[in-house]
């Protein structure tokens, strides 16, 4: 049972509840700040409040905000990529039932993994598996290899269609 405060934040659209796309609600539930203003505020303002109050923000901005901005934008970029796939859903190789993310444990490596985008099929065992990278650097084939490894850990489908989104482009 969630607290009344968390429920209120969810009702206001400030917080959202996420579970891995193919899982039933339970232990793997996480709560995220959905509202971009609140995400920015709580990511950058409290930790830099002294610099802001004393007028030094312009001087420390490159290290305090700019250096961490790509990490901050990652969640927003993931949403944009999901929206892109939904917009072009009719031209995708499968008919989507839903789209979300998935996380779990790679038992071979004993580490947590996350797949940014998983599209579940209306029929069959074909899934969309996607990665979203909001970085200035170009990404290479190693990202596809990693995504294929993650798909094998996900293990729900018999066939996967891979989509990789990159702000910086590809090598």
Regions found by a protein language model. Name each.
Residues 1-13:
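Short amphipathic alpha-helical interaction segments
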Residues 2, 16-18, 104:
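Glycine-rich, charged/polar anion/phosphate-binding loops
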Residues 10-22:
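A short, conserved structural fragment
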Residues 21, 29-171:
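A cross-kingdom feature that marks ATP-driven nucleic-acid transaction machinery
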